[in-house]
Amino acid sequence: MPSDGRCWETLRALRNTSKGRLRYDREWLLRYEDVLEECMSLPKLSSYSGWVVDHILPNTSGHTQESAPSSDNSPSSGSASGLYQSSLLKSPVRSSPQSPSPSSPNGTQSTHESPFTEPIAPQSSRAIKVEGCIRMYELAHRMRGTEGLRQWQEEQERKVRALSEMASEQLKRFDELKELKLHKEFQDLQEVMEKSTREALGHQEKLKEEHRHRAKILNLKLREAEQQRVKQAEQEQLRKEEGQVRLRSLYSLQEEVLQLNQQLDASSQHKELLSVDLAAFQTRGNQLCGLISSIIRTTLESGYPTAENQAEAERALQEMRDLLSDLEQEITRASQVKKKHEEEAKVKRQESQVQQGPAPPTQTSAPSPSPVGAQNEDLQVKVQDSTMQWYQQLQDASAKCVLAFEDLTSSKDSQTKKIKMDLQKAATIPVSQISTIAGSKLKEIFDKIHSLLSGKPVQSGGRSVSVTLNPQGLDFVQYKLAEKFVKQGEEEVASHHEAAFPIAVVASGIWMLHPKVGDLILAHLHKKCPYSVPFYPAFKEGMALEDYQRMLGYQVTDSKVEQQDNFLKRMSGMIRLYAAIIQLQWPYGNRQEAHPHGLNHGWRWLAQVLNMEPLSDVTATLLFDFLEVCGNALMKQYQVQFWKMILLIKEDYFPRIEAITSSGQMGSFIRLKQFLEKCLQRREIPVPRGFLTTSFWRS
């Protein structure tokens, strides 16, 4: 139809325009969703819709009626018109009022003006048809785009669903693979654990087998060891029984030797009858007693006596018997000689009755000194009578002091007990605090002890204490103070030799102001260390052996005697304290006042020790300790006489000590010998270590 041809021409003309040559992107919908949303939004009326209704629609209806017959023949035109009308109703006019109108039939163009200025001339039917075609094209294009978009969306949804399903399936496969992997790892781990368990069980079985094997071997060894132990125990028990038998035998031998020695001492009443010196028999008897005592001490330290020890003791006993037998023979012979002399004298008296005056007395010559190394006849074991009287007086004074405060110590009253404890602490604690720290500190301790003994109150344990709290307080404090001084020598000085001097100077100062304390110090010292007298206690008939050992200074606990080394250590400490006391005076006291127990007592002690038979291991130890502490002071006091005594020790006393000292006890003897030889070589006794100088008292 002519109208269709014109439409296509119009379309070709439009395609040749600048806008028609524009290329449109088919995929714009994916990138410009906002444009699609704008197209799908509800239509809005243009500002020219009112004008179109007033001017275009009336004219359009007239043309429609005129072309109705032709419309029947041209369905495409009708449809186009319908579409056009519908497009007018659904969408606003796209062209602006200023857009140019289609060309007129005569080829001229008319310009539309604004409806607000002047009315626009209605378009021709051709223009309307063209515009309708355009709108129909746009509608068709829009429908195709919408359909394509819908299909694309459906396709995308299908793809998304497919991808989701695929991802879900992949996730399931991943979970299955993971579960499979975990299951496999668990199986591998279980296999490894089972393998390890099997290996461990195998190793355990192997260890059990080795353990059973070793246990079997060990049981065999244990049985062998048990058999060996039983055998050794039986041998030890047998040896112990034999040793106990030998020890009892040694004690019996010692008791018999001591009894024989007493018989020797009892023979002194026949001294006037004997032509020989009785001291030689007594000296040898004492040596034999000391020999057996040293054998017993040595065996107690080492265990039990051996057969050689018993044989040696039996030889000593036999020698003692022979000695007593010889003495008895000498006494018998002397008695016979005396009887014969008496008979001759009787005859002579009868013959000389006619003679006037008695016969001149015979003079006895003085004994000549024995050569070095020979048996010295004037040495003895017993102490001098005057010394024994002095010793006994001190012990009696100590016993009276104990009786004086017996009510205080035995009281059941709590207040009295408290007073006793406070007094004991006030007396003993200051002595325990004595040291070489400073002279001022030592003076404070001395003043505190002096105040306590003087009846003044002193502070002890945060309380005020005085001896006036109890009538027996002073005796109790004096006794405990003296006991503590000696105990410090027994313990502190024995371990630290330098401690002898500060303790001794305080004791010496207290002794000068309170003489009773000094006597009690000597009593305690003599009781614990009889060698400080010097006094060698004798074994008496009927005396228990333990009591005799206590008299000698040994500590006996549960029938067990202390070791010899510990015994010598305690004796050494007390002798050192005694040697320090006799040479020191309290520096703050009266210098003109004589020492209550000075160096003259040290000289007496040394002389009496040298006049007595030495004891194995004891004499050498105590001589060394005494001379090391007090030798310098004695040298300055007695000078030449002191060196004569040192030479006497070296030349005459050393051989005696060496004769009774066994090979295992030579240490103390060698130490004494080297000390004296060095002193004789230097012609000086060195100042003892720890001696308190004048600078100490200024500290």
Swiss-Prot record:
GO process annotations (BP): nucleocytoplasmic transport; poly(A)+ mRNA export from nucleus; protein transport
Region (Interaction with NUP155): 1-29
A GO term from the CC aspect: nuclear envelope
Swiss-Prot/TrEMBL keywords: Coiled coil, Cytoplasm, mRNA transport, Nuclear pore complex, Nucleus, Phosphoprotein, Protein transport, Translocation, Transport
InterPro entries in alphabetical order: GLE1, GLE1-like_sf
Region of interest (Mediates the shuttling between the nucleus and the cytoplasm), residue spans: 445-484
Modified residues (Phosphoserine): 41, 91, 101, 352
MF-aspect GO terms: identical protein binding
Subunit-structure text: Associated with the NPC, however it may not be a stable component of the NPC complex since it shuttles between the nucleus and the cytoplasm. Interacts with nuclear pore complex proteins NUP155 and NUPL2.
Family of this protein: Belongs to the GLE1 family.
Name of the featured protein: mRNA export factor GLE1
Organism: Mus musculus
Chain's gene name: Gle1
